[in-house]
Every structure is written in C-alpha cells, then in structure tokens.
From Swiss-Prot:
The lineage of its organism: Bacteria, Pseudomonadati, Pseudomonadota, Alphaproteobacteria, Hyphomicrobiales. GO terms for cellular component: cytosol. Belongs to the Fmt family. This is Methionyl-tRNA formyltransferase. GO terms for molecular function: methionyl-tRNA formyltransferase activity. Signal peptide: none annotated.
C-alpha cells in the first residue's frame, strides 16, 4: 500500500521530490513549508516553491511559525502520517515531531554525510574543491544531520559546475532516491547504516561577507569561490567604469592562460590575473540587471587590458 506522508520543504530543490512522491501514488496528507515572504520589485508576498507545487497537487499547505507548541504537535499528529519526508524545510524539528509518524521522519540531504552536515552543503563542497558530492536519505534524529543513512547517490564536481548545476542534478537524483527509499520503507525493507564519526565537517551558512573575490589566491581557489557562490549571494569584485568602481557579480568563469599582477585584466576578453595564473569571466551580473555573458557586457562596456579589478 502507498504510504500516507507529510511533506516538509521550502525551496525549488524540494519540489521534484514532492512531485515524484505524489506521482508514485503516495498520499500527501499535508505539506509544511515556510511562510510567504515579500519579494520582487513590488515586495509582494510570495509563496514558496513547495507551496506552489502543493497547490497543483491540491494538497493542504501549512505554514506554522513554530513546531514547538502543543497546538502545532496536535495538528501534526492529526495527519496520522506513516512517515514524514523533509527536504530543505528550513526549520529544526523538535523530538516530539520526529517521534510522531509511526515509521519516522526521513530527510534528503545534499552531501555525502558525514561530510558537510549543516546549512550550505552544496556551496561548501564546491568551495572546498571536493571531487564529488551527492545526496543521501537519512532517518532523522535530534542531531544536526546525524541520522542513520538509508541510500545515497554520487556525482562528480567539475571545474565548470556552479551551485546551480550541482543543485539541479542533486534535486533530480534526490527525488528518485526518496521514491526508492519510501518504496523500501513501505515493504519493510529499508536498511539503515550509522554514520561514521570520521570525516565530519560542517557546512556553515553562507555569509555575504565571504563573497568578495580575492584575486591574490590561487587560480583554482578563485574559480571554486566564484562557482560555489553562484548565483547567490554571488562572488563579486569592483570594475572601474567611467571612473567609478562598479560592483559586478561573477557567475561563471574558466581557468585561462596568462599571468599578471593579481586583479589585473590581461587581455580584451575579461581575463583576470590571479595568484598563480588567470581566470576568464564568461558570465556576470551588474546590480539591478539580468545576468549576461562577458561578451555582451564588453560590447556595451569595454574594459581595457591593464585595468585593475578591486
């Protein structure tokens, strides 16, 4: 029999899993997500990506501010769910909620645990230069991403990949992984393995103060920094335009030939010298503008060889 599930998630990363579980016949008893927030130029309240997907499924949507009250617990228990599936919900579940579903709560986490427990595993894996990452289904416990692991999928991280690329691959793989995990849970065959305590690292939330690019660092470190923060919050530098420093987010780049002083533009194609080589910018964004290719940018704003980037 299909399972009766409570789904808990918020961003676009969680949507494929919600839709896949519904498509495979599971009964989505309720969808928990974060409250609508003001966004866009008009700062109108916008529902989360998961809320919008839940409406398409005609599933009940709940946006509690807390799960730590007696009322919230009673409401959660009233769904009489077999299990809860949690994907980037953005709120810590108290033990009483974890204990409520008969078969437990299962989280889809975007790393190869125990590496990169915490809030920003996709960013940190790229920024650290990891050769691979992945997605795991774990049975949740009271710790921070410390639960027993059920299933995993891996992907390679190449120099060309940004957080967007990793996000999209893992969202698709994760949806399939959770469907398989719930199928195994349904038939009583889901096997769990305790996480190793060797190799534990924590993926701290990204701080905007980290975003400025330091071109004195080695080339590959600069590339990883840029791709690990793309598109949000976006690694940035300042280009002198019409005599004024203008902040530019660098969204994509590649390792290029050439040398110069760190931060020096060394050709007419927005190739910038780093500590031991250079990167060539391929996509960027000015404040208030849409992302554009470096070629498009240079057509309207030529940057001469020898200019220093701040």
């Amino acid at each position: 029999m299909p399972l009766r599930l409570v789904f808990m998630g918020t961003p676009e990363f969680a949507v494929p899993t919600l839709l896949a579980l519904a498509a495979h016949g599971h009964d989505i008893a309720a969808v928990y997500t974060r409250e609508p927030k003001p966004a866009g130029r008009g700062m109108k309240l916008q529902e989360t990506a998961v809320a919008l997907a839940a409406h398409r499924l005609q599933a009940p949507v709940l946006t509690p501010k807390t799960l730590r009250t007696d009322e919230a617990l009673a409401n959660f228990r009233a769904h009489e769910a077999d299990a809860a599936v949690v994907v980037a919900y953005g709120m810590i579940l108290p033990q009483a909620i974890l204990d409520a579903p008969e078969l437990g709560c299962y989280n889809l986490h975007g790393s190869l645990l125990p590496r990169w427990r915490g809030a920003a595993p996709l960013n940190r894996a790229i920024m650290a230069g990891d050769a691979e990452t992945g997605v795991m289904v774990m049975k949740m416990d009271a710790g921070l991403d410390t639960g027993d692991v059920a299933m995993a999928e891996r992907i390679a991280i190449t120099d060309a990949m940004t957080v967007t690329d990793v996000h999209d691959q893992l969202a698709r793989l994760g949806a399939d992984l959770m469907v398989r995990a719930m199928a195994a849970l349904e038939r009583g065959g889901l096997q769990l393995t305790k996480q190793s305590e060797d190799g534990v690292t924590y993926a701290a939330k990204i701080d905007k103060a980290e975003a400025k690019i330091d071109f004195a660092k080695p080339t590959r470190a600069v590339l990883r920094h840029i791709h690990g923060l793309s598109p949000f919050p976006g690694a940035w530098c300042e280009l002198p335009i019409e005599g004024q420093p203008v902040r530019i987010k660098v969204l994509r780049c590649a390792i290029a030939d050439g040398r110069g002083e760190p931060g020096e533009v060394i050709d007419d194609h927005l190739t910038i010298a780093c500590g031991d080589g250079a990167i060539r910018v391929s996509q960027l964004q000015r404040a208030g503008k849409q992302p554009m290719t470096a070629e498009e940018f240079l057509r309207g704003t030529p940057i001469a060889k020898g200019v220093r980037v701040g």
